[in-house]
Amino acid sequence: MSWLTPDLIDILLSILKAVVILLVVVTCGAFMSFGERRLLGLFQNRYGPNRVGWGGSLQLVADMIKMFFKEDWIPRFSDRVIFTLAPVIAFTSLLLAFAIVPVSPTWVVADLNIGILFFLMMAGLAVYAVLFAGWSSNNKYSLLGAMRASAQTLSYEVFLGLSLMGVVAQAGSFNMTDIVNNQAHLWNVIPQFFGFVTFAIAGVAVCHRHPFDQPEAEQELADGYHIEYSGMKFGLFFVGEYIGIVTVSALIVTLFFGGWNGPWLPPFIWFALKTAFFMMMFILIRASLPRPRYDQVMSFGWKVCLPLTLVNLLVTAAVILWQAQ
């Protein structure tokens, strides 16, 4: 076993962590689609999926089998390469962002010193998936949905980044592990409450979730930028949306709610419970809020979220300078 050097062991452990995180996040995203339908049924005083398996427990398996056997159709006048590339980017962009999230003190795939910047870069990469899907489909509804999505995502990514600068200033680092360790005694949600509110709103918008789902509004755009997709390509878009929810929920926990910190229970359990809570909040928001007009969404971002993030950053900088004196 002389070939098993310490460097090789580190590489193998990193690969193992990446595979485990990949399987867990994809599984959580898939099961969230089933849980969302059950919870929406509960909120709306009706039954959710309850036909396949005991209490609908095998509905997810039935959906996966149906997705595998559906025709993988590509429109005749579409750009085939870009049309195929778009769902792959949508699936992998926010999945890669989860690599920087520390699940426990010893379990993180990539402990980057520029962790937050890496997340913002991956969130920006997701815009290309939407643009590619809308433009390559050669469909007017798809293109309109892509234009809406790109404008909305680029706008709310400004607030997404600015809302994190207060957290970075307090921790003195872009490293996610350092930010969690800085919350050992006080969670960032207390001194950075406005930053948390803005980040949560922008996170919902970046995931294109209700009430910020105008890019795929069924009543207006007939499902928006992925109207021409079917089979596994549509499945990648579908699961990618829920992976985005898992990633944003995990980032909210890591940046504002102490990450794995908590009494009595093991660190991983605390992280999982907090993340599951915010995943349920995504579902509750969908069940309870109406969909505003597109102009109202953009106006809310630039007239409410942007001033709020700037005020939060200004107050944070003033407090840090006052404490340094």
Swiss-Prot record:
Cellular compartments annotated: Cell inner membrane
Major localization class: membrane
Catalytic function, reaction form: a quinone + NADH + 5 H(+)(in) = a quinol + NAD(+) + 4 H(+)(out)
Listed InterPro entries: NADH_UbQ_OxRdtase_su1/FPO, NADH_UbQ_OxRdtase_su1_CS
Membrane topology according to the record: Multi-pass membrane protein
EC number(s) recorded for this UniProt protein: 7.1.1.-
Spans through the membrane: 11-31, 81-101, 114-134, 154-174, 186-206, 237-257, 265-285, 304-324
Biological process annotations from GO: aerobic respiration
One GO cellular component, as annotated: plasma membrane
GO molecular function, one term: quinone binding
Function recorded in the entry: NDH-1 shuttles electrons from NADH, via FMN and iron-sulfur (Fe-S) centers, to quinones in the respiratory chain. The immediate electron acceptor for the enzyme in this species is believed to be ubiquinone. Couples the redox reaction to proton translocation (for every two electrons transferred, four hydrogen ions are translocated across the cytoplasmic membrane), and thus conserves the redox energy in a proton gradient. This subunit may bind ubiquinone.
Protein family (similarity comment): Belongs to the complex I subunit 1 family.
Subunit structure as annotated in this protein's UniProt entry: NDH-1 is composed of 13 different subunits. Subunits NuoA, H, J, K, L, M, N constitute the membrane sector of the complex.
Name of the protein in its database record: NADH-quinone oxidoreductase subunit H
Organismal lineage: Bacteria, Pseudomonadati, Pseudomonadota, Gammaproteobacteria, Enterobacterales
Gene that this polypeptide is encoded by: nuoH
